[in-house]
A protein has these predicted regions:
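Conserved helicase ATPase core of P-loop NTP-dependent helicases/translocases
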Residues: 65, 80-90, 250, 259-261, ...
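Conserved Walker A/P-loop ATP-binding site and its immediately adjacent core
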Residues: 41-73, 256
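Conserved pre-motif I regulatory segment
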Residues: 1-32
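A conserved SF2-helicase RecA2
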Residues: 179-193, 337-401
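Conserved RecA-like P-loop NTPase helicase motor core
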Residues: 99-105, 124, 274-367
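Conserved interdomain linker/interface between the two RecA-like ATPase lobes of SF2 helicase motors
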Residues: 175-250
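Walker A/P-loop
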Residues: 23-46, 252
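Post-DEXD/H (motif II) to motif III coupling segment of the RecA-like Helicase ATP-binding lobe
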Residues: 123-195
Length: 467
């Protein structure tokens, strides 16, 4: 019989409170759960709790299967609407992939769907995107997103890329974080396998940022892969893993071509890429899960939604500037399994140096700064990556108890839904949300920027209780 873990119970309680919240600005909420924390069960528990029709969206076939199976395990009844499964059936509980339902929002609305649940909500949940358009067709009362990585890497032509929290960028549909289970709590409660890090030397001189500045160019990634003799080093590390008793190894590489080159060097290995036919992919993964195949090399797939608790070895040769990709790849091996005492993670792309160990990561609503991702006391979000790092001590503001004074010549809002309104008529919850959108451009065509900054300073004082 399924017994929920304490963090799953707390997440469910926070979701329940969110569903009862009638604040119109609190429609889109994010639940943060580490890799291996059992998001599928939290989704299933939420669906069970609801008394109205619900739509569950996940980006891949693998995640859909995983989430659907967990709900059925708990005794639920549901249907699947997905071309990947060759079944398209709507019901009061529907599990789906976005591409299959993007044009049937009206049909889903007619079912009476009031709640939408989105797994891996950091992925393609931007305003104006497929999922956003679908939500607008359905018009639910609440949208609940779940993810291990509530961040988005956002480019800027003038300042370079910034890593932003999902609720602090105007490009994301989500505006609040309603629950966080920290990685350190999962570890302290014994729900992660002990990670053995192997941080191999990496020369990054060949890497070049792409035009948006949010990642490295594909060509420079391949060149760096080759300059570091990565194929040979993967084989060497794989052999070391096997000699240590590692039973199952998943390898991430930067291209389809490199996957097949490596396949020729590791006896008995198999390859899965985003070009592999679904039927062949299923057969390969079944052999891997059954222990027939010891090593699977992959590109463009298996980063999320691949549930293999016995996996005890990952070699990551995929160079990335994305924390989400790094964490998802590393997270494939943290799940608990019988007779699995430790998990070996080998990094050949400089990713550990770039992001640190995942155990040190926390997502925190810090004092009057708001939500941020931290590694210890170091802030990792909310400012251009080219700038010097910021720490918690830099974020602590001295609050003046004197009533704030609007020293700006600007007295009314000049944009958005409250355009033309005097400040006194604008809800503080909206002002607070607006100030937390790190990507929002504060500009007024009729006033100099110094006046805009004075206005913004006054807004900050208002939400801090000085107005």
């Amino acid at each position: 019989m399924f017994k929920p873990r304490e963090h799953q119970v707390q997440a469910n309680l926070d979701i329940r409170a969110f569903l009862k919240d009638t604040n119109p600005f609190n429609k889109y909420g994010v639940v943060v759960q580490p890799c291996g924390a059992g998001k599928s069960f939290i989704i299933a528990m939420t669906v069970q709790m609801l008394k109205t029709p619900v739509l569950v969206i996940q980006p891949t076939k693998e995640l859909l299967s995983q989430n659907y199976d967990k709900y059925i395990t708990l005794g639920g009844e549901a249907t699947i609407y997905s071309a990947s499964f060759n079944t398209k059936e709507l019901s009061s509980v529907t599990y789906s992939t976005p591409g299959s339902i993007k044009n049937i929002g009206k049909d889903i609305k007619d079912l009476g769907v009031k709640v939408i649940i989105i797994d891996e909500c950091h992925y393609k949940c931007t305003k104006g995107g497929v999922i956003d358009k679908l939500i607008k067709q359905i018009n639910p009362s609440k949208v609940i997103g779940l993810t291990a990585t509530p961040v988005i890497l956002e480019p800027s032509l003038d300042l370079g890329s910034s890593l932003l929290m999902l609720n602090r960028t105007s490009k994301s549909i989500f505006n609040s974080i309603i629950h966080v289970t920290q990685i350190k709590d999962i570890i302290s409660n014994g729900y992660w396998t002990n990670i053995i890090y192997h941080n191999e030397k990496f020369d990054s001189k060949s890497l070049v940022k792409n035009s948006s500045g949010n990642d490295f160019t594909d060509s420079s990634i391949i060149k760096s892969f080759e300059d570091n003799n990565t194929l040979e080093r993967i084989v060497d590390n794989y052999n070391k893993m096997i000699s240590k008793g590692v039973k199952h190894v998943l390898i991430f590489v930067p291209s389809v071509e490199k996957a097949y080159e490596l396949n020729d060097l590791i006896k008995g290995s198999e390859v899965v890429t985003d070009e592999t036919k679904p039927k062949d992919r299923s057969s390969i993964l079944k052999r891997f899960l059954d222990g027939v195949t010891r090593c699977v090399i992959n590109f463009g797939i298996l980063g999320t939604g691949f549930d293999f608790p016995s996996l005890d070895g990952v070699i990551n040769a995929r160079i990335t500037n994305s924390f989400a990709i790094y964490y998802q790849f590393l997270g494939r091996g943290v799940r608990l399994a019988e007779n699995k005492k430790e998990y070996h993670y080998v990094d050949l792309g400089g990713n550990i140096d770039r992001f640190g160990k995942v155990e040190d990561i926390i997502f925190e609503d810090f004092l009057d700064y708001g939500w941020g991702m931290f590694s210890g006391s170091k802030l990792l979000t909310g400012y251009p990556l080219i700038q010097d790092p910021k720490f918690k001590k830099d974020l602590i503001k001295v609050v003046d108890n004197k009533p704030a004074v609007n020293k700006s010549k600007i007295k009314n809002f000049w944009f958005g839904k409250h355009s033309g309104k005097h400040l006194a008529r604008v809800p503080k919850v909206y002002i607070d949300w607006l100030l937390k959108q790190d990507s929002f451009k504060w500009y007024h065509k009729d006033y100099k920027q110094v006046e805009v900054e004075k206005f913004k300073t006054y807004l900050k004082a208002l939400v801090n209780g000085q107005g």
